[in-house]
Amino acid sequence: MFNRFNKFQAAVALALLSRGALGDSYTNSTSSADLSSITSVSSASASATASDSLSSSDGTVYLPSTTISGDLTVTGKVIATEAVEVAAGGKLTLLDGEKYVFSSDLKVHGDLVVEKSEASYEGTAFDVSGETFEVSGNFSAEETGAVSASIYSFTPSSFKSSGDISLSLSKAKKGEVTFSPYSNAGTFSLSNAILNGGSVSGL
């Protein structure tokens, strides 16, 4: 059991930490069982400080409590049950996932980008339903090639934006954007979307 825990710690370190001073970059492909166990350890946290990427064999990545201050690309579906923060100057790229769930705090002070590498794909389901969703940086999604409707749901207890939120969805299959009442001091731009929203202050 002790050896297994040590291997787990090493896997986490390789996946989420890089030696920025040397410019090294690590790419890790880990089973969902290993990744999901991260969230069961209350003291587990991670910091991506340089150029990293995460993927898993079954297409689902379970993010631990994480602060991202460098560039991190996550490929596939993402489940985050603990707080995720993209620090100023950091970038989180969510690549080729059909579902993203953030059920704790999501704070974007840098850049969070939803991207696809294929010309056509199924629409994305993106759900933020934790305590706090805060954007002072840039949140953008480019879904113009979706062949089914993309669904974006921003329904946290507290939703504040002083940055830029941009959702460009498919013309062929209009997406749906649902948001709870929120405070806006930035820019929220949508295209090809059906809106289901609460009140907005600060416009």
UniProtKB/Swiss-Prot annotation:
Q: Which residues form the propeptide?
A: 185-203
Membrane topology of the entry: Lipid-anchor; GPI-anchor
Which top-rank group of organisms is this from? Eukaryota
Q: Where is the lipid attached (GPI-anchor amidated asparagine)?
A: 184
A GO CC annotation given for this chain? plasma membrane
**Where does the record say this protein resides?**
Cell membrane
**Which sites carry carbohydrate?**
28, 138
Cite the entry's keywords alphabetically.
Cell membrane, Glycoprotein, GPI-anchor, Lipoprotein, Membrane, Signal
Give the signal peptide, or none: 1-23
Keyword ATP-binding recorded: no
> This protein is called what?
Putative GPI-anchored protein YAR066W
- Source organism of the structure: Saccharomyces cerevisiae (strain ATCC 204508 / S288c)
